[in-house]
Amino acid sequence: MSFDIAKYPTLALVDSTQELRLLPKESLPKLSDELRRYLLDSVSRSSGHFASGLGTVELTVALHYVYNTPFDQLIWDVGHQAYPHKILTGRRDKIGTIRQKGGLHPFPWRGESEFDVLSVGHSSTSISAGIGIAVAAEKENKQRRTVCVIGDGAITAGMAFEAMNHAGDIKPDMLVILNDNEMSISENVGALNNHLAQLLSGKLYSTLREGGKKVFSGVPPIKELLKRTEEHIKGMVVPGTLFEELGFNYIGPVDGHDVLGLVTTLKNMRDLKGPQFLHIMTKKGRGYEPAEKDPITFHAVPKFDPTSGCLPKSSGGMPSYSKIFGDWLCETAAKDNKLMAVTPAMREGSGMVEFSKKYPDQYFDVAIAEQHAVTFAAGLAIGGYKPIVAIYSTFLQRAYDQVIHDVAIQKLPVLFAIDRAGIVGADGQTHQGAFDLSFLRCVPDMVVMTPSDENECRQMLFTGYHYQDGPSAVRYPRGNAVGVELEPLTKMPIGKGIVKRHGEKLAILNFGTLMPEAAKVAESMNATLVDMRFVKPLDETLILEMASRHEVLITLEENAIMGGAGSGVNEVLMANRKPIPVLNLGLPDRFIPQGTQDEARAEIGLDAAGIEAKIRTWLA
């Protein structure tokens, strides 16, 4: 979309953060209003993360107004809320390309802009990185300031508290801003708190505070008494005791939509020494009533008409794999009250909304705490229940030690329902489910299943749920199922594949939902097609049979080639002295950027045309 100067006259004056800092302070509310309207106009035309950015407009304006970015370093946690930041840092005219192939990255990205200090996508990393950045600046004697912005969801993760505990110990000069948009920590927002925040962050209070520390440093009982008195007084009116105990100077909560008040408070805090903590209260979806009322639905949106206030409805095609899982979950829970479903803040994405309403006593959303989710499930299994951990492939990476140490070593029957496996599309490098087959198949006693369609997905979930000799995993992609008939649920024989088509010289061993593409190639090349189903244990008998009957083998998977299912096939062949040529096809050894799933598969040659072209080139 072209930028309409007439609609956004103040925003038009801001082509850089230097120009922003030249504006009179009184113009910042108008700038914030225009920035919010421009964000609404842009995202509604192009799609993208929406509600979070609407809630951080004033904060973003205030931060770039007060701090000398990019010299001063601003770190956004996760990055859903960073669209206003991108608009103000030279990417305004490209914001309509966000999450598209060749367009702006969906999150802050170091390779995209010097203003993006940390590449992000997963949550709760900002404070840890910020401490390292602040320490590096101090060691280089650079007078740059470090600011981390983290949400009230992300701050619940253990990593964030580990970082704050460390900051309290080494006391770097840095500011952590808690963007609290769920009222989950405090509701004490109002004129008194805003005034108190400005008072507590002001020079007079800070001077008296530091002066008192020096005067009474040699009199420990008095120093301790003053410290406890200060904590008591602040604790009566602010909810920051926890952060104070971690070693931060806590200020807040303040109104995160009062841009002038934020500027005053940030200026006061800018030169304070040691770890500082500013708690701001915002409203997700601010300024657009439908998003304010339903921020979850408007978290990430397709193209829509903002005047209607409604998102486009589903076209009514095939159900998503997430829905297939959710329906199976409800169906199983209706027959077994021992089922316990666990998810780390992925209720909507994992298709668990209906289940959470129907079976609230069997549903646990542990927040952004993947490590805890897995070990919590281990405890449920020890207690005689049947836990299912519903988690995205990319987030399971964060709990790998728990999968091994707390589940697999003890051979606990935990079922992992791994959503968003393979190419996910618009969220790019940080969210592709590229590695789960590689890091799971090397874990002893783990059963790993890759369905080729929704019927197999249900059968595998059923099989894993009833498997009691250790952990199991079923991985399935983002997107819609293929439309096959759903059969009655039965347990599948563990580690057995099936031949779908008999051919001549070539055999394609397919793992997972690339099966429709593999079928087209098999038909075109008169190849044998095998639905391998299991990555672990592999069907070694079937692999050796295919090797004996064919001249070459092709393995196909939507996982990293290195260490993936194809590598397992190679190992079987070598162990059995079957020196047959094998071509492993899958995700290449690089991080795959944003774009649609179809665009990504076409680019890396995992659509039917690309698969056939790679095979023919290899055979030539």
From Swiss-Prot:
Keyword Magnesium among UniProt keywords = yes
State its Enzyme Commission number(s): 2.2.1.7
Q: Which GO terms describe its cellular component?
A: cytosol
What is the cofactor note? Binds 1 Mg(2+) ion per subunit.
Recall the GO molecular function terms of this protein's record.
1-deoxy-D-xylulose-5-phosphate synthase activity; magnesium ion binding; thiamine pyrophosphate binding
Q: Which GO terms describe its biological process?
A: 1-deoxy-D-xylulose 5-phosphate biosynthetic process; isopentenyl diphosphate biosynthetic process, methylerythritol 4-phosphate pathway; terpenoid biosynthetic process; thiamine biosynthetic process
Keywords, sorted A to Z: Isoprene biosynthesis, Magnesium, Metal-binding, Thiamine biosynthesis, Thiamine pyrophosphate, Transferase
What metabolic or biological pathway is this protein involved in?
Answer: Metabolic intermediate biosynthesis; 1-deoxy-D-xylulose 5-phosphate biosynthesis; 1-deoxy-D-xylulose 5-phosphate from D-glyceraldehyde 3-phosphate and pyruvate: step 1/1
**Record carries keyword Magnesium:** yes
Stored InterPro entries: Dxylulose-5-P_synthase (IPR005477), THDP-binding (IPR029061), Transketo_C/PFOR_II (IPR009014), Transketolase-like_Pyr-bd (IPR005475), Transketolase_BS (IPR020826), Transketolase_C (IPR033248), Transketolase_CS (IPR049557)
Q: Which residues bind Mg(2+)?
A: D152, N181
Which superkingdom does the taxonomy of this entry point to? Answer: Bacteria
Pfam families under this entry? DXP_synthase_N, Transket_pyr, Transketolase_C
Gene3D superfamilies for this protein: 3.40.50.920, 3.40.50.970
Q: Which reaction is the catalytic activity of this chain?
A: D-glyceraldehyde 3-phosphate + pyruvate + H(+) = 1-deoxy-D-xylulose 5-phosphate + CO2
Q: Which cofactor does it need?
A: Mg(2+); thiamine diphosphate
State the SMART domains in the record. Transket_pyr
Its family remark reads: Belongs to the transketolase family. DXPS subfamily.
Q: What is the protein's known function? A: Catalyzes the acyloin condensation reaction between C atoms 2 and 3 of pyruvate and glyceraldehyde 3-phosphate to yield 1-deoxy-D-xylulose-5-phosphate (DXP).
The entry's protein name is 1-deoxy-D-xylulose-5-phosphate synthase
